Amino acid sequence: DADDLAELLGEDTRQGKYFSAFDADEELVGWFAFSCEGDCVALGLGLRPDLTGRGFGLAYLEAGLAFAEQRFRPSRFRLSVATFNERAIRVYRRAGFSPLRTFDHATNGGVHRFLEMTRPA
């Protein structure tokens, strides 16, 4: 929504945490967000909607993880995903993430169940 977009694009928010991802033709394909929590990097990501479901997810995720490993040198990664997003969960599992716990989170006008996943760097 508009508030989320304004937050993501605001200079105060980005401060070395949010990164745009471009393809070889310099077209925007998505974004990554990284937050260091001790030796763990919490990861957020988004892929341009017209690119989802086309087999790009794993390569996109692996590129972001490689970038974060080089930049932040974590010992592990953590992410959270809505439990209804089964396609993303399959990609995260293929990338080596394992379920850690589920929790409820208020977002976008409702309360949704999320799955926290982790993997070694």
Language-model regions, residue ranges each:
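Acetyl-CoA-dependent GNAT
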Residues: D1-T52, L58, F67, R71, ...
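Generic, low-specificity signal for short hydrophobic/alpha-helical stretches with a mild N-terminal bias
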Residues: D3, A63, R73-P74, P99-L100
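Conserved glycine-rich acetyl-CoA-binding loop
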Residues: L45-E62, A82-R90, R94
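Sequence-level detector for tyrosine residue identity
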Residues: Y18, F22, Y60, Y92, ...
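C-terminal "cap" of GNAT-fold acetyltransferases
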Residues: P74-I89, R94-A95, R101-A121
